[in-house]
Curated annotation (Swiss-Prot):
GO terms for cellular component: plasma membrane; plastid. Interacts with TCTP1. The keyword GTP-binding applies. It holds the Pfam family Ras. Intracellular vesicle trafficking and protein transport. This is Ras-related protein RABA4a. PANTHER family: DRAB11-RELATED (PTHR47979). GTP binds at residues 24-31, 72-76, 130-133, 160-161. Keywords: Acetylation, Cell membrane, GTP-binding, Lipoprotein, Membrane, Nucleotide-binding, Prenylation, Protein transport, Transport. Residues 189-226 are annotated as: Disordered. It comes from Arabidopsis thaliana (Mouse-ear cress).
Length: 226
């Protein structure tokens, strides 16, 4: 269970570091989602992200300290050159579209294809329909996105960075899933050691940033209703 909604203590011991990337078209609200989660801020004057930036937030999951390292890059085509470095070591991804702009949802399969080409094959992915506060401007029915997420084996939520709806839940869903996968791997390694098998990770701090090896759960368990 995720707890400790604070924004981190510099002196706190870190048990895990999870790299999560935000991807999607420009102006869907990726930077706003990150600002809301990392600093609980929202600015109507937010400018397009140029290049790459990342922010961190430390939280507690099952009594373990987890640092989320969240990367954000602009969605314009001219920044595609950063992709391989951007995706390297990521164990979670947030695939964001704007519920008021149909083309941003239509581009999601392309973003997903790029993600799967560059990232670890077992990366934990959540599809996010942002700007859910703009109900009267909705262009993508929730059911369409939910159906796509189920077909592709993704988590799904609709969020609003403006009023903070489901922003915490979206990050919590991804980070908790990664944590559970890592814990299962650690437990399996510990059992191997007890059985005299080599290659155990027991007793070691597991830093996930260099490269994951998760197993995605069954699709039937992966879609989170908004």
């Amino acid at each position: 269970m995720t707890s400790g909604g604070g924004y981190g203590d510099p002196s706190q011991k870190i048990d895990y570091v999870f790299k999560v990337v935000l991807i999607g078209d420009s102006a869907v609200g990726k930077s706003q989602i990150l600002a809301r989660y990392a600093r609980d801020e929202f600015s109507l004057d937010s400018k397009a992200t140029i290049g790459v930036e990342f922010q961190t937030r430390t939280l507690v999951i099952d009594h373990k300290s987890v640092k989320a390292q969240i990367w954000d890059t602009a969605g314009q085509e001219r920044y595609r050159a950063v992709t391989s470095a951007y995706y390297r070591g990521a164990v979670g991804a947030m695939l964001v579209y704007d519920i008021t702009r149909r083309q941003t949802f239509d581009h999601i399969p392309r973003w997903l294809e790029e993600l799967r080409a560059h990232a670890d094959k077992n990366i934990v992915i959540i599809l996010i329909g942002n700007k859910s506060d703009l109900v009267d401007q909705r262009a993508i029915p929730t059911e369409d996105a939910k159906e796509f997420a189920e077909k592709e084996g993704l988590f799904f939520l609709e969020t609003s960075a403006f009023n903070a709806t489901n922003v915490e839940s979206a990050f919590s869903t991804v980070l908790t899933e990664i944590f559970n996968i890592v814990n299962k791997k650690s437990l399996a390694a510990s059992e191997d050691q007890e059985n005299g098998n080599p290659g155990s990770l027991a007793g070691k701090k597991i830093d996930i940033v260099p490269g994951p090896g998760q197993v995605i759960p069954n699709k039937s368990n992966m879609c989170c209703n908004s």
